[in-house]
Amino acid sequence: NRLDDYQWKNRLILVQAASENGGEIETLRSARAEIDDRDIVWFVNTGSDVVSNQKAVSGSLESDIKAVLDESRSYGRVLLIGKDGGIKSRESSLDLDAIFRRIDGMPMRIREMRAD
């Protein structure tokens, strides 16, 4: 599968980790309920591997993730991609509270919350 396969289904958080044990993976895993509630799929590029809350990351998907993170490297290490496929924010560090606030202010998310 490819990054495009998530469009209109999931919001994506892509993280270029500072190191293999930089804490980003644990931060994301500890917020599982909030992440699942917002239809978020996350990927952390540790340099040697891509870790995700998905079962498996194919070679083509890993290539897509690394390419997008490489293109945005000068703008930030953390990308939020909306369900429409557009980049919604680029940050220098992973701040889940800020990401959740940004998502919760998006029109599509507001409609989802009303429907629940």
Language-model features, listed with the residues they occupy:
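Non-catalytic interaction/Regulatory regions outside core domains
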Residues: 1-116
